[in-house]
């Protein structure tokens, strides 16, 4: 016999064959019974003393106490699974000898409980459930606290725990309120009852539901199903993001883990979408998203149309500096640029090349520096090579002023005036630009 800690965590299914008992032989089994109409709010009490006190067994059935149990090893999740300790609860319940049963022995209930079928939803019991028996054989279970009985009315719903199926604890899933408001919900607590109206995860789009589009509940007091669910108009976001705590049944309605999930196989979601009409605000937002922006002229087109001087603003025309030399069309934005340009028209060339034998003079210093780089820093040219102006030479020294050897290397200690001719012999007219 395995430890009772492992037995309470196992899910056993009981096959009951009662050919010797009928509704007349068992007085406690004469009223109709449905797991969804159970007056107790906890999952464990669905088969405890208050809910099992009035089940209806099939008339042509017999019960055998010593019936051997069948071990099911199918890969599918256990259906109609509950704990064996729940069957032994209650005073009027038939006491079944459960001490010799193994924890994996399973017997199906769908043939003997009305309202259940092969697709019945799994009723999982939380693992934190306190263990109420003491003996390892658990011949009986401590009596559960009696809950107040409620009238078995369709509109009086007991508060059920979050471990029950969504179809049993959520009124949004239990009946289609839009198309069939007065139809009684089937007794089966399976997922197939809501396949014909539940939308898939791809069709859950944000929509505004107006009061005129939703048919109200029938008149009469309605017990709130759970604290996790409020009134139905604000119920859709909660239903979409709700994920059951049990890992065996956790199917996130918002983020399915695979392409072939129960949610992806749900059909009939088009009927659900047709019940909701897009609100004007939502429709306007969708139309604005698809509208193309109006074509505006680009900045380049505006600049090209205003490139001519006639179209320039007056403030830009005032800063135009034109060259006053006849025949020159030079225009400058700054006055210093115009002054530098005017030197090219004058005879003043104060910047003279210092290389011996070169008599080039320039009106601007930048022109002289360009002359040094392009003319005297290269070997094999028609002008004299100067090693002090060559950046690749080991004698590079742009500040050197003195005598040079025939191959262009500097003669340190010499003065530039020694080899320079008299300045009076040179005329400014002989200098090249």
UniProtKB/Swiss-Prot annotation:
Basic residues bias locations: 288-302
UniProt xrefs under Pfam families: zf-C2H2
Compositionally biased tracts (Polar residues): 240-264
Bias type Low complexity, positions: 30-49
SUPFAM superfamilies for the chain: beta-beta-alpha zinc fingers
GO annotation, cellular component aspect: chromatin; nucleus; transcription regulator complex
UniProt cross-references to InterPro entries, sorted A to Z: Znf_C2H2_sf, Znf_C2H2_type
Spans annotated as Disordered: 24-49, 240-269, 286-306, 391-423
Effect of a null allele: Completely destroys asexual development, resulting in masses of vegetative hyphae that branched into the air and formation of white cotton-like colonies.
Name of the protein described by the UniProt record: C2H2 type master regulator of conidiophore development brlA
Gene (name only): brlA
